[in-house]
Every structure is written in C-alpha cells, then in structure tokens.
Amino acid sequence: MSADKFNEILKMFQQQMAMQDIPDREKAKKWEEYLFWKTQPVPKFDEDIDSEGPIEHKKLEDVRPTPYNLPAEYEWSDVDIENPEHIQEVYDLLYDNYVEDDDATFRFKYSASFLDWALKPPGWQKTWYPCVRVAATGKMVAFISAIPTSIQLRDNDLIKAVEINFLCVHKKLRSKRLAPVLIKEITRRVNQKDIWQALYTAGVVLPSPVSTCRYYHRPLNWTKLYEIGFSAIPPNQTAASMVARYTLPKEVPLKVRAMTKADVKAVHAILQNYLSAASEMSQHFSEEEVAHWFVDPISEDKNDDKIVYSYVVEEDGKVIDFFSFYKLDHTVLKEWATESNLRAAYGFYYATSSLSSAKARQDRVKELIGSAVILANNLGFEVYNELTLLDNPSHLDDLKFGCGDGYLNYYLFNYRAQPVHGGLDKQKQLEQLDGKGVGVIML
C-alpha cells in the first residue's frame, strides 16, 4: 500500500472516530438552565456583539468586603503556595478529583514542581489561592486559583486580567454547589486588586465561548499508547505498521540549543512580534514572565522535577526562533492497563522571525515543531499534544498528529468579544486560515 493511500485511510479513520463525539459536545443547555452563569457578566449564546469591551463597570467601593457564605460545615482557608504541606494538599485533591477524560481512562497528574511553576508567575498574590475545608477536620475539599495576566485582543486596549485555573471540588461534594461560591469568591478577591476581567477554559459548554480549540496527539511510543487504550489500530493496519509510521529519527534537523536566561530579552522580542502576527487573542508577556514560563531552574533534561523545555535557534549569533513544551504526566486509571503513568509533552509557546508572509511563518513553525517532537521523543516522552491554536493547524497532518476527542473552550469573564478562530471549521474539523486565531495557552 502506498504512503498516500495509508495516510488517506488513517485520516478517514481518525475523522470517523472524532465525529462520533461531536454531537454530544455541541449540546448546550438553554440560557435559563444556567442557574449560576445567567447571573454573571458573560455573553449569552449567539448574542449580537456590536462592540467589544467590558460588560459591567464597577469600582473598588462596589466590592463585597467579606467572603461569601459557605454551608455551616465548611470554612474558607488560604493556601500558602510556598508551604510544601499546602502544595501537597492541593496535589492530593487534584490527583483524586480533577479532570478526567470522558471514559475515565486518564487523569492529569499535576506534580508539586508543576504547581509551583504554574501558580507563582510574576505578580502572584497570596490571597488568590482560596480553598474550602471541612470545619471539623480541616480536610481540603475544594480549591481555585488565579494568576495575573495581560490579554491582547485584536486592536483593543490591553486587558488587565487573571487566568482562572484548577477549579476542583471533591467528587462526593459536587451536589453542594461549592463551585459557584468558589468562582464568586475568587472574583471578589481579584476585584479587590482592581482587576475586573478573567480568562478561563473548560471542556464543557458554558455561556459563551469566545473560541473553541481541539486537542491533537502525536504518538511517540505507539506501542505504549496502544497498550493503555490511548491509541487504536485503524482498519486494515497492524501494530507493526503503526509503529513504523510513527518512528522518528534521533537527529534534530535544526541546530537548536536549550534556552537560558541570557536569551530572555531576544525571545521576548520575537515572541511578541510573532503573537501579533499570528493571533487575534494572545497573552502579552513581560520579560519577567518570559523568564518564569520558559527558563526552568532545573537544567538537567532527565530530572523528574523538570517541567518546561525551551529551545532557541541562532543565526550569526542572533536568536531567530524559539519553541517550548512542558511535561504533564497522566495517571492511567483502567485496572487492566499494564502501565499506570503516561509521560506526556504539551506544546507550549513558540515564535519565529520568519514573518514575511503567512506561508513563510507556517513553514518555519512546522520545522520548529518537527524538531520539538524529536526532542520530546529523545527525552522519553510517549505522546506530544497540541491544540488547534496559533499556526498549529498548518502542520498537524504533516507531522502525523491525530485528532483527539477533547475540545477546549475559551471564555472571557466580564468582557464581550467577537469570536476568535480556534483552528476548526463549523463541523469542528481542522481548518487553517492565513489570518489569526487563538494565541493563549493555559496550563
């Protein structure tokens, strides 16, 4: 069978598998059924948006001075993210109760070092990590976090905002409606710092997504992925043919090196220029944020505590390209699985100086991500994941990524905005535009 025919069959199989999931994900409740969200400053579904900007305009004196009430058996507590014991409590809560895939096969495994990196960017605030504890025992049963960010949405003024993440409620307490109280409380605490907008993501449909992206996966260790139920064998194929398809060279085609602190200024410049060229909604980085997010203090690649891997390409002593990915392992939940851990790399930010045209930009990005995939494989990662944002749609097929069954909806709180392209067409299939899309990557 020719390579072209094989690719055609595989692509059809992937699309058929993916399309089975789309109808359920498309279902959104009626506006009236969103008992909490209909009380919040968020757009309704299909709302006509004539102009972009804040929905509500409030002042500091409007902010409630005291925490929101909890059921009598629970109490508020602040997580000290510099206290290893508190971080361990957050880890335990997330490990047992946080995001799983629909089939309850995999769960994110946020390590203590990952949480330390994710929750302490420049400008982090001690009061932005509230949790709920059982009053009688002190057991942590719910958590939410906020970190500062700045969002550039098209040509609008820079949006001073926060990213909301790690909203988690103990499984046995989901009927207590603690999540809405957590959201209101973190909103109150953020408002106290004169910040009125937020960015958050969710796999579920809420009022009202500004964009929707889809997960794509590039197998690195296909045999392992097959054995744990992550990958399947398409019709008329064998395990041997799949292993052969996804085999990678050891040598990286580009001359790359690990990013260091000395590269921060150069990376900051090319990253901001690239995001302006390739996205309609992006994070606006400071040099301090570039240093935090992309320069891991652990330099040894094989160290289990290392989280982010960043690389640069130089030409005549000048940094011209940059790419990164981060480690987020998954726990395998199925009892029949022979392995309990999936070592996953997630594509993070990248940038190139090749901005003369959309095609030049996308061709160079394909080379960068092709190198990232090889490096991740050499480091022992078993799958490389990307979303359909930035210029990713232009290389996903060529680099042998397969569409997953996971979607990620992006939301803006207290901000009305026109939709931002998420790399998908109306049927939720891959669509590359020469224009701009989502340029924000949340952990």
Swiss-Prot record:
GO terms for biological process: protein localization to membrane. The active site is at L443. One of its GO terms (cellular component) is cytosol. One of its GO terms (molecular function) is glycylpeptide N-tetradecanoyltransferase activity. PROSITE patterns: NMT_1 (PS00975), NMT_2 (PS00976). Its EC number is 2.3.1.97. It catalyses: N-terminal glycyl-[protein] + tetradecanoyl-CoA = N-tetradecanoylglycyl-[protein] + CoA + H(+). It is found in: Cytoplasm. Adds a myristoyl group to the N-terminal glycine residue of certain cellular proteins. Monomer. This is Glycylpeptide N-tetradecanoyltransferase. It comes from Yarrowia lipolytica (strain CLIB 122 / E 150) (Yeast).
